[in-house]
Amino acid sequence: MVNISLLEKSIPVAPIKIAALKSCSQLASQVDAHLVQFRKELNSHNPSGLIMRGYAEDTFLIECKCPRFGSGEAKGVINESIRGADMFVMVDVCNHSLTYNMCGYENHMSPDDHYQDLKRII
């Protein structure tokens, strides 16, 4: 049994946002579903009656991507505002199943490619 009494009495500092890169989208969906359910249950037992902005959301995932150019270079794009939020970035650097085109050839993403995408989102 997990003791969450301290969590029930605390007030969150900022809303949570999860930026899941393509390599980790399935795990991020599971984390998001668990977090949504947990926060809604915890919010329903809120004794103070305070409603915190962004505490209980339908999803904490944000839309982000790292599109690649023909040269193999990429850029990080976040399609919504994350100002004032605690952002967590999820990436699986060992996922070799993803590919991208560079100079007309299909390349598998290496751990370094995933790490570069992580830095682009940050």
Regions found by a protein language model. Give the residues of each.
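PRPP-associated nucleotide enzymes
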Residues: 1-122
